[in-house]
């Protein structure tokens, strides 16, 4: 498998696909996912990080805020990864040895499709593939919301200034 992508045909239950499908790696809901017949409980807080548990045992943890910062440390069943923002839109994922294992982007419908592209044919365990895909999607969504809020705030201030100038 060279990449994973998200099928958002059903908005409330996006599916994580191996490449463009049809193989489904997981079906996600707001607070849970079904991965390989197992239920993952999901908790994501953009200001704090994200955690996935399976049977009460933590399997995925993003230690850093998803909304801001240039690095997000991720632990998946004891294996360490770091998501590094090369630019505000382009990210790479390095393993504990600093080797690039994957990349993702916000460009070209990146938030909707959230493609996680691996360095060649990946040999990562399924838990790592799904965990990295989930955290990368949460990171992209958190940053999209942050950017949208900044635009709304700027437009509100500019509208108030324009109204004040017009009335005076």
Label every model-predicted segment:
Residues 1-139:
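Cationic, beta-structured binding surfaces that engage anionic biopolymers and membranes
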Residues 134-168:
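C-terminal single-pass membrane-anchor helix
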């Amino acid at each position: 498998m060279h990449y994973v992508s998200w099928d958002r045909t059903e908005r409330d239950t996006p599916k994580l696909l191996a490449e463009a499908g049809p193989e489904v790696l997981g079906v996600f809901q707001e607070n849970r996912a079904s991965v390989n017949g197992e239920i993952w409980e999901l908790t994501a807080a953009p200001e704090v990080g994200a955690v996935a548990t399976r049977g009460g045992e933590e399997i995925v943890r993003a230690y850093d805020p998803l909304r801001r910062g240039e690095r997000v440390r991720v632990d998946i069943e004891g294996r360490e990864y770091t998501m590094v923002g090369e630019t505000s839109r382009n990210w790479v994922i390095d393993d504990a040895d600093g080797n690039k294992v994957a990349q993702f982007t916000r460009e070209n419908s990146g938030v909707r499709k959230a493609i996680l592209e691996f360095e060649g044919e990946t040999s990562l365990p399924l838990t790592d593939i799904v965990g990295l895909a989930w955290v990368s999607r949460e990171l992209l969504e958190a940053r999209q919301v942050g950017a949208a809020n900044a635009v709304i705030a700027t437009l509100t201030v500019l509208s108030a200034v324009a109204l004040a100038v017009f009335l005076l």
